A protein has these predicted regions:
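ATP/NTP phosphate-donor binding region
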Residues: 1-82, 93, 136
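ATP/nucleoside-binding phosphotransfer catalytic cores, i.e., glycine-rich phosphate-binding loops
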Residues: 3-10, 70, 235-333
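Short glycine-rich anion-binding loops that position phosphate/pyrophosphate groups of nucleotides
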Residues: 12-13, 88-90, 112-114
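Short Gly/Thr/Asp-enriched flexible loops that form oxyanion-binding sites at enzyme active sites
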Residues: 71, 76, 88-104
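Structural motif
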Residues: 85-86, 109
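Short, acidic/small-residue loops that bind anionic groups at enzyme active sites
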Residues: 95-123
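Short, glycine-/small-residue-rich phosphate/pyrophosphate-handling segment
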Residues: 112-146, 150, 155
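ATP/pyrophosphate-binding catalytic subdomain of soluble kinases
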Residues: 137-259
């Protein structure tokens, strides 16, 4: 499969500078005729010495995550065949939100901290596989997350409320302060429970309301997307049932901290058992939660979306086919 007209977006903060090098290799593998991309570090620097005609987009009036979204929209308007995005799960989610409703598929090259979402076509170390590869377009389900009735972002791996997000510092995956991350700072911080005496989580389906958890039961809240890999794995608990019922998403609330990069074995042993509560989510459902401790942040695929106050209400909904992603066919070498 060949792509004559390619849009390119590079997150220069991903992979400790490896994103731009991976972009060069990706373009060599795909060999497009024309490339639309942001000037300089957002993609233009990857085009030096390549034969493709470059269309450089001036993003200088923008900063932060708004740059990727703006470049993505200009690429779609130019009529590209595919958007090649180099970054992590959060960058890919930002781009998917920016072009929501477009027929242009995403080719995601994972250069971030986790790189576990379904929009990742391949990892940076595997970009050589793109040369002469065959792809299939996959319609990917996703989560819409927001606060007080307004959608703020998309998640294709998970949506969480937490004090920290994952980031890479000196080549190591660590927990960093979510509020600091909103301003581009990676400040190490230990995870903390988000729940207090007034915390609540419910699922709504029309007039039917199901209480999921409350108070100290809510140390961690994760909405995610189960799939058929859980089928037959009974130890997965409620997630297994969602996979059997073809429910596109679910919510897990746990009395332990689950999103962490370090764990003291002895302390964890003393704290067991681990108690969790789970509900499946259909497209007709709306998950709502509030009463969090001060400083908790709503995050989607590692992107901090909103600092929550005690009176704010977070919501999550699921939609099938929320994005179009390219997947390497199994017989591709």
């Amino acid at each position: 499969m060949t792509f004559e007209r390619v849009g390119l977006i590079v997150n220069p903060q991903s992979g400790a500078g490896r994103a731009l090098l991976a972009a060069v290799e990706a373009l060599r593998a795909l060999a497009p005729r024309e490339v639309w991309t942001g000037a300089g570090e957002m993609g233009g620097d990857a085009l030096a010495g390549l034969p493709a005609t470059a269309h450089l987009l001036d993003w200088s009036a923008l900063s932060g995550r708004a740059r990727s979204a703006w470049i993505a929209q200009r690429c779609v308007e130019a009529g590209v065949d595919v958007l090649v995005v180099l970054g992590g799960d959060g960058t890919l989610a930002d781009v998917a939100l920016a072009i929501q409703g477009s027929a242009v598929p995403l080719l995601g090259v994972g250069v971030g901290t986790a790189n576990v979402g379904p929009l990742v076509t391949c990892l940076a170390v595997d970009v050589g596989r793109l040369a002469g590869a065959e792809f299939e377009v996959v319609h990917v389900p996703g989560l819409l997350a927001g606060v007080n009735g307004a959608d703020l972002g998309l998640g294709f791996n998970d949506v969480v409320v937490d004090f920290t997000v994952l980031a890479t510092i000196d080549g190591q995956m660590v927990n960093v302060d979510a509020v600091g991350k909103m301003s581009g700072q990676n400040i190490r911080r230990d995870p903390e429970p988000i729940g207090g005496p007034d915390t609540w989580v419910i699922r709504r389906e029309g007039a039917i309301e199901t209480q999921v958890a409350e108070g100290a039961q809510v140390a961690t809240l994760i909405a995610g997307l189960p799939d058929k890999r859980f089928y037959g794995k009974a130890i997965a608990g409620g997630v297994l049932l969602s996979a059997m019922l073809d429910e596109p998403a679910g919510c897990l609330v746990c009395d332990h901290l689950l999103i962490r990069t370090t764990l003291d074995p002895a302390a964890h042993r003393r704290s067991e058992p681990v108690l969790s509560r789970y509900v499946g989510l259909r497209e007709t459902d709306r998950l709502e939660a509030g009463g969090f401790r001060t400083g908790a942040v709503l995050c989607a695929d590692g992107n901090p979306l909103a600092l929550m106050s005690a009176t704010d209400i977070a919501h999550v909904r699921v939609r099938r086919g929320l994005a179009r992603s390219l997947r390497l066919k199994e017989n591709t070498r």
